Amino acid sequence: MKTLSAKPAEVQHDWYVVDASGKTLGRLATEIARRLRGKHKTSYTPHVDTGDYIVVINAEQVQVTGKKSLDKKYYRHTGFPGGIRETNFEKLIAHKPEAVLEKAVKGMLPKGPLGYAMIKKMKVYAGTEHPHAAQQPQVLDI
């Protein structure tokens, strides 16, 4: 039996909606990264984007365990010499709740053109409303 190799034109991408309220950040991010990559499908091919679209709602209600809300650091650089900036989980979730989940999932995906295409298929929203009702996303319980 020959090995199946998916072709980009033949891949079917489904839409799923995930409710992040009360979920642990890391456990949620690993499952989302797995689905974006397409590893849950039998037609998974490493060099082809076989993953699904994921819509995450209630990103502001994602949780971390222990003292990570104060200890977990996020870094960014302004582009100027000495321009490294640091913030913790608590401040970032208050200011930009979508960025926490996006950074967690992005770090779990491959780096390069294929990984960039995968991260674009994840849509994160702080509240319960999202503009993707036309795609009829299925509820995914994680």
Curated annotation (Swiss-Prot):
Keywords: Ribonucleoprotein, Ribosomal protein. One of its GO terms (biological process) is translation. SUPFAM superfamilies: Ribosomal protein L13. One of its GO terms (molecular function) is structural constituent of ribosome. This protein is one of the early assembly proteins of the 50S ribosomal subunit, although it is not seen to bind rRNA by itself. It is important during the early stages of 50S assembly. Part of the 50S ribosomal subunit. Belongs to the universal ribosomal protein uL13 family. This is Large ribosomal subunit protein uL13. It comes from Acinetobacter baylyi (strain ATCC 33305 / BD413 / ADP1). The gene is rplM.
